[in-house]
């Protein structure tokens, strides 16, 4: 078997920390801490009781998650072993595929579930522990964070008890919070830790929220073109970020003026929508943060006496970047210093905002203003409202609790009436523009991780329309199925082989034996194998399906432990080794090659400590899985022998002595002695099966059912053949010419005709229905074979015999061309084997059926 290249695993050394405590009742030593050292690395991990750990499992990418409850050393065997007792968590991929719909939503990528199932094995090998993991419990109303890069942070919100998902109880929620708080205290620091992990100032929820914000701010800054920021935007963003003193120190160096002028703090953020940046003179309302005098004093903005004497409305207009009226004299000089070329500070000529300067620059900016304001103001405000609606949807999607407050601060002037906005727009002259400069990419990258910015609304994902992306599915019925129009049509539906009957008659004992075998394995949490044999059509597969259906109902009623059912059929496989692929895909949903799937299944059923439920595997048509090495049969029968497998195999084949006839000794020994043979149905059993199918339906005469049952029981005892004959009899009865007063029941004549069609050869039927000239040509072939003593003759010899037979019977003999056409037609029906017609008279002719069958078909009735 070819092996795939696997990842090189580092060797780890496990040792106890501290003195042991002797448990006199269980006679082993317990510990409170364990040290894990990795070969070739100077770091070490200290694991204590109560922490959450990762444990080796079947999938290296998704190891098992558990809470460490106890550490002890088992010295019952000569080499002492390090053992641990844990409380398991389960991932969504570990939940059975048939029960994943019970969650009712899409699970988070890093969401796990508390495994509330006491019957699982919680005693594991302590040397299978990989490392520590952080588990954060969430309340039922909390949203599981998504798209987090920290793989060692998991979230638990619900519990899973093999039947349904439940929210965490208050006691369990408090218990999960306790070790989370003490984990940082009891865990010793490791050199490889980063500064962010060591800082105790952030709570887990705030840490996750900051990472989400930094990612969205980074994506937004890459998509947004660089534009100079207006004083209004600077003041507003500056006031919005007063709570972060570190941010103020970083951004205060970005805009420096001369010593005589005022220093201003600038915080760059892409809060405004693209439509607002393209139209800087748009009317805006003052945010609540700008109206607070306390926050205004913290920003370091100083006003002159004229500004203090001015009314609040004028001060609002000054801060919100709306042009001042001509009667106000603004004498204070303010320096606008956009960052350019990677420099952290730059000095530019100051611009004095006075009415005279505004008048001079008004003419220069008129053309640019007309181009920028080509869209009506009312339409621009509607587009900004749409943008804000998209931002609100994105904030709800991220689950940010502060979204409502931030929306109020950046809400545009949507509540102002149309008339008042038009009047203000007509009375306010445009303010001067700044030439755009390139903002430093390095500075922007340093700031984008700490600023909270709003992200663009992701586009709706379109459904794939190309055939290569479309998922294959069975066509759905556009119209409802029509109900049977007659009694015979209803009988045909009930007699179909695939129709599921209400009961399974004549197999009560076999049903009980198989049910008891599987039920005992489920209750004992062990594995086993049963070999079921019998001729085709004796109800082997139907009986097993009925057993599984009853066990599934019992599992739902808590009578037996839950299990997973898998069925494979050797008839549906293109190659015997594909059985590994089918089992792995139905068990875990993974897709792999045959060799890789065999390795994964062997690891699944032979690894200790894996918290899995019992698997019932039905292998139908087992004889088709035979190979020269018989490795497939050996693996299927060897896996249930392992204690940790919890695998029950039900193998079905048509041969009773298959293990002794074709299996090796090592394979037949793994199969065991639990075998069951299904005997062919007798006449009375077949008659009972037919009557149970036609219950409360009068479509057959009693003698017609008895005739079919006796005929089939004498030949094979196949129930499927019996059902097919009865269905054909209903078709013959329906299409036969009957009198108007006939009862319309299937009689003995109809059943006899159906039996003859079923058991007679198709070649004989074709010869009986052939023309007189074709039957005469077949007689000529038999006469020539009898004359020459060979079973092959040329067309010329057969034509001579054909002419002689026609003269003896007084019939006009056909021409050579007509006889050649008859020979070609019989050859196309595969009654004859003929050479190509280019040989003409010398082409050789043979019979494709026996001479006795031809004589039987040509005899006079």
Swiss-Prot record:
Q: For Mg(2+), which residues are the binding ones?
A: 620-621
* Entry-annotated residues carrying N6-acetyllysine: 326
Q: Where is the composition biased (Low complexity)?
A: 440-456
* Superkingdom in the source lineage: Eukaryota
| Region (Necessary and sufficient for ORC complex assembly) location | 501-861
Which parts of the sequence belong to the BAH domain?
A: 45-171
Tell me what effect the entry lists for residue 720 to Q.
In MGORS1; abolished ATPase activity
- Note down the stretches annotated as region Disordered: 183-233, 269-312, 360-382, 412-476
Site residues, Histone H4K20me2 binding: 94
* Signal sequence region: none
Q: Where in the cell is it found?
A: Nucleus
Has the keyword Magnesium been applied to this entry? yes
Pfam families referenced in this protein's UniProt entry, alphabetically: AAA, AAA_lid_10, BAH, Cdc6_C
MF terms in GO:
ATP binding; ATP hydrolysis activity; chromatin binding; DNA binding; DNA replication origin binding; metal ion binding
Residue stretches of biased makeup (Basic and acidic residues):
207-216
Q: Name one GO biological process term.
A: mitotic DNA replication checkpoint signaling
Q: Which residues, renumbered to this chain, carry the PTM Phosphoserine?
A: 199, 252, 255, 273, 287, 340, 417, 420, 478
Sum up the protein's function in the record's words.
Answer: Component of the origin recognition complex (ORC) that binds origins of replication. DNA-binding is ATP-dependent. The DNA sequences that define origins of replication have not been identified yet. ORC is required to assemble the pre-replication complex necessary to initiate DNA replication.
| Name of this protein | Origin recognition complex subunit 1
Phylogenetic classification of the source organism: Eukaryota, Metazoa, Chordata, Craniata, Vertebrata
| Gene that this polypeptide is encoded by | ORC1
